[in-house]
């Protein structure tokens, strides 16, 4: 069972599961072939989410790291209708005595959407709706500062954009996973202000 003290192994288990699920017997039935899983974006998305979650579990101690589930605030007078509402399930939440940082990981071959009629690009609307809903409805009885981060692998268009609304920040960030580990580590720590750029 994965728990706080061995959370890093959760990522390794995900890697092993990916290898297992991407293996198939060849025609002889005696050997395994490894399928090209890089075309399976759902598996890559789960692997990326697991990596980021376990990174913050392992590489820092300021924040508590979790993936909380919480309900929508809507209520029906009919109990059975309340059970029809889906829960909000976050990817990664970092929380200390002052801040709640909600990180939603995404994995796309194209980070931005392109409008064919105007030829303009923009962030994907469902991503923004999702992180905004999390920020508005996550339980926060102590009224901590809440911020949201949409984190993407860099697929050729580096992005680091921060927006503000009513003292809440939303950041869109890509990270290059093809760089040295120290650079990846520093970027992820800087993302939540655990180190500053001078230390990178």
Give the role of each language-model region.
Residues 1-39:
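Residue(s) in the substrate-gating loop at a strand-loop-helix junction
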